């Protein structure tokens, strides 16, 4: 879906797009939907990694999957970036084993941008590493700080550690040790942050272990979806509320766009040697287009 729009963006932004997957299925789907794929490269990859497959399958039984072939293409210089909506565990495994980590980085991490009252906040890690060591969290803070500075243009970004309280002594052993290491790091570490403060303009980078980070990002998405449904329900109550809805329709569309994670593109995998980005398995065509624009 959306290949036609992707192609328009390719021409506009001078991006060369290579679709990696079953050539037969890609061409058949394009033909059935009357979509021109002229000018878009196709790299044949017959295997498929499902969401049920083990992460290690990308290096073993599924080494001819679109994910494996695409990452090899990136590693060999045949591509400049790789974008996937596939199995998260397999993508992390493949990025680590095929593309390789940046020298000195212990573990790569998912790092999505999320909306806040003013601008966006980067969350790192949002699920790549369920169990973390303190030094990993320190590296996450450094990588997140560099990204927000160099890529997002936020000078001296504020880095905070996700915790159960703002006091220095809060949290378990991991948080205590990570707090001390983050204080020593060459970044603007502002201390602990509670989840309720993340949507406000309290920090620019949120550091978390993958378990905590994944809960934060999924809760973010769930609350946004539930809130929009509730607002719609309230506006549809009666004639007066429907009239009120008509008066603020433009504003509501802006709010919906602000709350929709599809409008924030893909999450880069920090810590690998070349750009690898992950988007939702349920991502819409617009999400891919936005991600391509970010890559360019």
Predicted regions and their residues:
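Glycine-rich phosphate/nucleotide-binding loop
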Residues: 99-107, 116-123, 202-206, 210-292, ...
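Glycine/threonine-rich beta-strand-loop-alpha-helix active-site module
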Residues: 87-136
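Glycine-rich phosphate/diphosphate-binding loop of Rossmann-like nucleotide-binding domains
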Residues: 18, 24, 131-195
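Short, small-residue-biased leader/transition segments that mark boundaries at the very start
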Residues: 2-7
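Flexible, glycine/charged-enriched surface loops at secondary-structure junctions
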Residues: 14-16, 151-159, 189-196, 237-246, ...
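Short helix-capping segments at alpha-helix termini
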Residues: 10-13, 31-38, 152-153, 182-187
């Amino acid at each position: 879906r959306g290949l036609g729009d992707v192609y328009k963006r390719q021409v506009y932004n001078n991006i060369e797009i290579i679709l990696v997957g079953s050539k037969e299925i890609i061409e058949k789907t394009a033909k059935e939907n009357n979509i021109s794929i002229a000018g878009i490269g196709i790299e044949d990859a017959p295997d498929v990694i499902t969401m049920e497959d083990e992460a290690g399958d990308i290096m073993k039984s599924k080494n001819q999957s679109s994910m494996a072939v695409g990452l090899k293409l990136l590693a060999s210089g045949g591509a400049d970036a790789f974008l996937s909506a596939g199995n998260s565990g397999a993508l992390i495994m493949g990025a680590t084993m095929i593309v390789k980590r940046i020298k000195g980085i212990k573990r790569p991490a998912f790092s999505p941008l999320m909306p806040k009252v003013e601008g966006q906040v980067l969350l790192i890690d949002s699920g790549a590493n369920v169990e973390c060591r303190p030094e990993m969290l320190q590296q996450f803070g450094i990588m997140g700080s560099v990204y927000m500075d160099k890529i997002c243009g936020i000078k001296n970004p504020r880095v905070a550690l996700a915790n159960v309280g703002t006091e220095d002594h809060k949290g378990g052993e991991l948080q205590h040790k990570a707090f001390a290491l983050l204080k020593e790091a060459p970044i603007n570490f502002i201390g602990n942050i509670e989840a309720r403060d993340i949507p406000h303009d309290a920090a620019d980078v949120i550091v978390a272990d993958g378990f905590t980070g994944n809960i934060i990002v999924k809760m973010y998405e769930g609350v946004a979806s539930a809130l929009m449904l509730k607002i719609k329900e309230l506006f549809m109550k009666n004639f007066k509320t429907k009239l009120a809805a008509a008066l603020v329709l433009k504003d509501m569309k802006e709010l919906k766009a602000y709350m929709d994670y599809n409008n924030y593109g893909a999450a880069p995998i920090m810590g690998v040697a070349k750009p690898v980005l992950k988007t939702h398995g349920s991502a819409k065509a617009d999400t891919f287009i936005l991600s391509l624009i970010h890559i360019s």
